[in-house]
Amino acid sequence: MPNQNLIALGFDFGMKRIGVAVGQTVTHSANAIAILKAQDGVPDWEKIKMLIETWHANVLVVGIPYNMDGSEQTLTFAARKFARKLQTRFGLPVSMVDERLTTIEAKRQWYEQGLTKRPQHLDNYAAKLILEQWLQEQKNE
């Protein structure tokens, strides 16, 4: 998808919460925008549809969790299933990104900003990092 101005929504999938970020390929920047509740990994599809329409997203990016050794875990399969359902429901291209260490990096950035209160949820910050990684890959193509 090089040489296109794309607006992307990035997702940090979880069984209870799904972090969402928005970014675009013109500036290769992303912003955390929402944390959606999920019930056993099932999101509120209408809220996702609303975010896609509000931001005029034309590509979706899902973080896929792996163990540090690269092996897969239960959540790996659930995140892939979520990515497939996004593609089927909304007919948009979906990219998957290795999301190892994004939550740790999100915490580091949180405290680096001088925010001392422990964050309750970092899912949307993790989604931002996932999306920034994808945007960097697009820039390098």
UniProtKB/Swiss-Prot annotation:
GO terms for cellular component: cytosol. Keywords: Cytoplasm, Hydrolase, Nuclease, Ribosome biogenesis. It comes from Coxiella burnetii (strain Dugway 5J108-111). InterPro entries: RNaseH-like_sf, YqgF, YqgF/RNaseH-like_dom, YqgF/RNaseH-like_dom_sf. Its main location: cytoplasm. Belongs to the YqgF nuclease family. SUPFAM superfamilies: Ribonuclease H-like. One of its GO terms (molecular function) is nuclease activity. Its EC number is 3.1.-.-. GO terms for biological process: rRNA 5'-end processing. Signal peptide: none annotated. This is Putative pre-16S rRNA nuclease. Could be a nuclease involved in processing of the 5'-end of pre-16S rRNA. It is found in: Cytoplasm. It holds the Pfam family RuvX. It is an enzyme of class 3 (hydrolase). It comes from the Bacteria.
